[in-house]
A protein has these predicted regions:
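Charged, solvent-exposed interaction patches on well-folded alpha/beta domains
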Residues: 1-170
Length: 170
């Protein structure tokens, strides 16, 4: 289901075609934010299909949010944090684009699964407010217990984050 910032509210079917909104409540991942119909069909649909095709992510991810720069955030059901994937790969060829999006999602979510299993299970599900998976081989997490105000230096803000390196998908 798509609820875009521009007011559009619709569903995508299995063929990536737009369907009108209905009053039926469905158990789907909702996508919000800076989404036009082309982006929904070409990027959100393969992203959500990849998430829904995995039992863990089908149960854990409840929302996809697209930022103005087209970066993608995921909102999980468990844990009070946001997961940032980064910007999805862009290809003009539809088949290459779909394959690249699925590969992108699988690589990021494999890293997140390991982090959930070996990191958050030890540190606590609510330790971090933001988990950034944008960069390969590292996960950057913003700790919840530190707030940045306007007078705080960049060094103090960075000290409020944890960088976990060498996190690769197998």
């Amino acid at each position: 289901r798509i609820k875009a910032a521009n007011g559009d509210d619709y569903y995508l079917d299995d063929n990536d075609c737009i369907m009108p909104n209905s009053h039926y409540t469905s158990d789907l991942i909702i996508a919000t934010g800076n989404i036009n119909k082309w982006f929904a069909s070409n990027y959100i649909s393969p992203l959500s299909k990849a998430l829904m095709g995995n039992e863990l992510w089908r149960n854990q991810i409840e929302q996809i949010n697209v930022l103005p720069d087209l970066g993608v955030e995921l909102i999980p059901r468990v844990g009070n944090h946001i997961v940032y994937l980064g910007q999805m790969p862009f290809y003009k060829n539809k088949e290459k684009r779909k394959a690249a999006v699925v590969d992108f999602v699988n690589r990021k979510m494999n890293r997140l699964e390991k982090f959930y299993k070996y990191g958050l299970s030890q540190a606590g599900w609510n330790r971090y407010s933001y988990i950034n998976l944008e960069f390969d081989n590292q996960i950057i997490c913003k700790r919840r217990d530190k707030r940045r105000d306007d007078n705080e230096s960049l060094g103090e803000a960075l000290a409020a984050s944890d960088v976990i390196g060498n996190v690769e998908a197998e």
